[in-house]
């Protein structure tokens, strides 16, 4: 049989190369870009907080002016130009994965949203807000990978879902330098399932993003390595149980506050949010500044420095620190600006560990702090496996793995008595069916009241955190509720994203109260 001519081999090789590139190269390139973006974003946030600290050291009272001003500006810019960038970003990713990615990703994972997420979270940390960068990094990673779908000639829902999942997991892994946590996070929190076909893609993306992060930052653990000693204390089991209950109650109350804003926030403030959301944001900024001054500046920022200082013994904090930090954290999320809750939750948990050390004086303080960190994080996220894997990798605490697992499990169960899973509940808002159209006159009047986003932006904008507030006890008659809805009809852009796919579960009582 004669050999084919050499020129005839080139088209076959070209087609094979393109097929290999589309099958593997896009994921590899995306993972590398996600790792690079995570490192650069972390450095930007760190620089922003150092700038805030330098300004505060120059003038202690400056946050009273700076924080409200930045809060107002951030909310105005978010609502005007970057609807979909609010909050941590993880609910947006979950909503995209649980529905048709092409429909939800086109609104929640665009490059415009990515830019707004980075920009406004930087402004938030520059103003001293109690926000983290890890949650936003998840949305940034998912958005970067999702936008690579255009390299596929025939993109489908399966490819898009794999891109989003791999980008989100790689983003979390690169943000914390915790590769195992990235895998567990994708399985437990994002999809609640395991696909053998997607596992190879997921692990490859995490490896490549992690290699980039390690190459730029070096091999490190997020909180360093703690010393647990050669022998565990006799009261370790009691300490695990008490810590899990305390942090479970605290984390559950935090989730309840975010998901039931209409039940505890005064009516005047709710009305202020509906009519003047920018003014409401300025008041939240003022509250953050006042709490920060009362705490001596320890509640500003994500809390990473405070948590690490407690772990290595270089810092002493008041027993009121975790409560003040919780107040600042709630005030940071009520306005609806971009920002994560992972790092602040770890800081609050460290504060509770420091508080409980007054009870368990014979225990190692770093050990107790590690237990409290995993307990509070598990209570807030209600993802116990992800929580203990994250903390275990961050402190290199393999010796504590059983204690961390037990604390995370008990704490997440205690938290569920107070509130449902936070991220899943927030994701349901994006999956909820659209609000029926209102009369043009009512829509115009409502638009004049909010004065935030033009009606033509409605299809690209998810719901606002405090819009269409309602009690969940069902005591209000349907007719009265309909009349009240007509009287206080939100603008079209406040109605939430139009659910274009029937795969998204329709929830009648979606979380309209929190961000």
Give the residues covered by each predicted segment.
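Alpha-helical transmembrane segments and immediately membrane-proximal extracytoplasmic
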Residues: 1-497, 501-515
């Amino acid at each position: 049989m004669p050999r084919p001519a050499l020129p005839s081999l080139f088209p076959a090789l070209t087609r094979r190369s393109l097929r290999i590139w589309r099958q593997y190269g896009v994921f590899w390139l995306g993972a590398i870009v996600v790792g690079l973006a995570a490192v650069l974003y972390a450095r930007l946030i760190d620089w922003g907080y150092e700038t805030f600290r330098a300004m505060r050291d120059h003038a202690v009272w400056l946050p009273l002016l700076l924080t409200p001003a930045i809060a107002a500006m951030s909310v105005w810019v978010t609502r005007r130009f970057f609807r979909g960038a609010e909050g941590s970003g993880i609910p947006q990713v979950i909503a995209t994965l649980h529905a048709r990615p092409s429909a939800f990703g086109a609104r929640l994972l665009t490059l415009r949203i990515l830019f707004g997420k980075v920009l406004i979270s930087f402004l938030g940390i520059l103003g001293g807000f109690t926000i983290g960068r890890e949650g936003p990094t998840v949305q940034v990673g998912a958005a970067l990978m999702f936008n690579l779908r255009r390299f596929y000639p025939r993109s489908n829902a399966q490819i898009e879902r794999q891109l989003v999942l791999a980008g989100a997991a790689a983003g979390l892994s690169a943000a914390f330098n915790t590769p195992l946590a990235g895998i567990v996070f994708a399985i437990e929190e994002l999809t609640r399932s395991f696909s053998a076909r997607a596992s190879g893609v997921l692990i490859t993306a995490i490896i490549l993003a992690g290699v980039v992060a390690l190459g730029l930052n070096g091999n490190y653990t997020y909180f360093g390595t703690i010393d647990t000693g050669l022998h565990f204390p006799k009261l370790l089991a009691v300490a695990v149980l008490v810590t899990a209950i305390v942090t479970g109650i605290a984390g559950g109350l935090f989730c309840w506050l975010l998901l039931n804003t209409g039940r505890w926030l005064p009516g005047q403030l709710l009305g202020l949010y509906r009519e003047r959301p920018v003014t409401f944001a300025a008041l939240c900024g003022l509250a953050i500044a006042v709490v920060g001054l009362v705490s001596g500046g320890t509640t500003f920022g994500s809390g990473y420095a405070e948590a690490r200082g407690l772990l290595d013994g270089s810092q002493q904090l008041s027993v009121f620190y975790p409560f003040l930090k919780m107040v600042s954290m709630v005030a940071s999320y009520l306005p609806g600006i971009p920002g994560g809750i992972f790092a602040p939750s770890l800081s609050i948990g460290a504060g509770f560990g420091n508080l409980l050390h007054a009870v368990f004086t014979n225990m190692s303080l770093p050990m107790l702090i590690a237990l409290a960190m995993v307990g509070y994080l598990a209570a807030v996220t209600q993802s116990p496996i992800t929580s203990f894997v994250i903390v275990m990798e961050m402190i290199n605490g393999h010796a504590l793995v059983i204690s961390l697992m037990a604390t995370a499990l008990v704490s997440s169960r205690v938290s569920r008595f107070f509130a449902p899973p936070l991220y899943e509940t927030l994701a349901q808002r994006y999956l909820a069916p659209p609000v029926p159209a209102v009369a043009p006159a009512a829509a115009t009047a409502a638009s004049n009241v909010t004065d935030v986003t033009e009606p033509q932006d409605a299809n690209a904008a998810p719901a606002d955190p405090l819009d269409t507030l309602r009690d969940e006890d069902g005591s209000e008659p349907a007719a009265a509720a309909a009349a009240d809805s007509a009287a206080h009809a939100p603008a079209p852009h406040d109605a939430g994203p139009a659910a274009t796919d029937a795969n998204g579960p329709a929830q009648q009582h979606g979380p309209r109260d929190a961000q």
